[in-house]
Each structure stands twice: as structure tokens, then as C-alpha cells.
């Protein structure tokens, strides 16, 4: 009996102190830009999943990408970065946004992002959602800097514990204008904004993507 009591006691203790991890994923039209104060890796961007601790608060920055319009009027809509703060869960979670069919819907989403967090079984998880305001020629390169400032501001979806982490991992912002800019190995110098953006994103891409882009550019001369 004593042995049984000891076993039951250990089992109860383990159950009460155990930490379970769940997976977080997104709907197909969302991509992770940052997770818990750190830039989302390229591999994570492809997998669109990461593991969370159910006892902790988590913060992600996501962006909605959607092809809108039809036929020859199709275009790519990219939303402003959106901050989503939520509590981890032992069950897998899905962060999702509705489909955007036209630019008007995209503008409405930018003004008031409709993003939900639910468990795989469909239960809604409380989440704080806010737009990460950005400025400059290459705003996506400033996500971590802007997020650090946001977390330090005490705004609705801010998490103060990520302020230091975000600041330490923040990227150097690419300057606007027609000047040369070094961002790692990235250098841009163009006659207009469009040319600078093309140079910037071309140098950000991997070799395979660069090759595909060059082939595409040749076919559209």
C-alpha cells in the first residue's frame, strides 16, 4: 500500500508540474515575420509552424498575402504587419485570417485586422491584435526595430519581456532616398523607388529565386 501511495503521489506531482507543448500554424494567406521578438527564419516561413510552451504568453507578427482581382486585373495584396499576442496551449493552435478578394477588402483589413486564434478542435483562444505601424522605403526590413519600440510603448498587444530580445535581434534599417545602403551585402542605388525596391529584393532572394526572376524579366522585355 505504501509503495502504491508513493507511485500515485509521484504521478500526481509529475502531472501537476509537466509542461506540454503545442504547435502553432497559420492559414495559407498568412506568413510569420517575427516570433517572440525574433525574426522568423526562412525555413519556418515555409513550414508555417512552430512550437509553444502552454504556460507562456507568445507574440507573433504576421502579414497577409493574397492575390486579388481576376483575369488581367489581378494583383498582389500585402497587408501591413499585424501583431498577435496570445497564451500558449497544450493543444495545437491555428492563427487565421479571412480571404481577401479585392483591394477594398484589403484596405478594410489594414484598418481593422480580422485575425483569430483557435485550437485545432475549434475553440477560440483570447488574443490581442494590433497593427504594427511602419514607415520608410523598406518597412519590412524594420520589423524588429518597430516591434521593439511597440513592446516598449505598453500598447494593447505589447509584451514587455520581448523588448530586450527584439532590440538585440533587430535588423539595420535600409535608408530611403537615392543613396547607397549597406544591409549586410545589400547595396541599392537607383533612379527611382521602384528600381531601388527591385535591387533590394533581388539581393535578398536566394540564387534559385534570382535565376527565376532573371528568366522572367528576359521573357517580358
From Swiss-Prot:
Alphabetic keyword roster: Signal
Residues spanning the signal sequence: 1-21
InterPro entries, per the entry: UPF0319
Bridged cysteine pairs (disulfide): none
The keyword Signal belongs to this UniProt entry's keyword annotation: yes
Descriptive protein name: UPF0319 protein CGSHiGG_02140
NCBIfam families with a match to the protein in the record: PRK01904.1
Organism in which the protein naturally occurs: Haemophilus influenzae (strain PittGG)
Protein family: Belongs to the UPF0319 family.
HAMAP family cross-referenced by the UniProt entry: UPF0319 (MF_00789)
Pfam families, per the entry: DUF2057
Taxonomic classification: Bacteria, Pseudomonadati, Pseudomonadota, Gammaproteobacteria, Pasteurellales
